[in-house]
């Protein structure tokens, strides 16, 4: 099944940051409703851009969004303390964004996720950086799924992000991801695939056409 994560509630966006700073609930509510009307299956909530204010901003955003949210929320933060606070506030089973194999992030996130009932975005990133082959992606995905399974996260609750990279940098980046996705699905039929699909067209003309084509290929992979 194709699912959409609405990512507009992110304080790295200037208008959202201003709305959060001003506690402009109407702006946030309108944005969330538009994402839901457009078909979002999850609403991502990221309050990390205002340094020193993430906890209070996340709390305000959740208080503002939850009364009108018809879909689950994606709690987006690298800080387990912020996620712990947010997890206790949410009414629907959330998605956590995200864990990776980077040692610092992995070591911080695993204790938080241990025993939690949630969905998890798992980035195919480790301390060596971005993956350079479909085998890299598959190996990292396998490690992430196995480690998350050990702490009670079922495979069906894991959303693997193979880290889509621009074909403007290397023309094989698209086929690399598609090959990896096929291999991941063969190994873990219950796992979900997610990612920043529009990354594929970065730096190129006719981005919408490229994006639509790549989405179709990913859905068929």
PLM region spans:
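Active-site-proximal loop/turn and secondary-structure-junction residues that shape catalytic pockets
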Residues: 9-11, 47-51, 79-81, 100-102, ...
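Glycine-rich anion/phosphate-binding loops
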Residues: 19-29, 98-108, 134-146
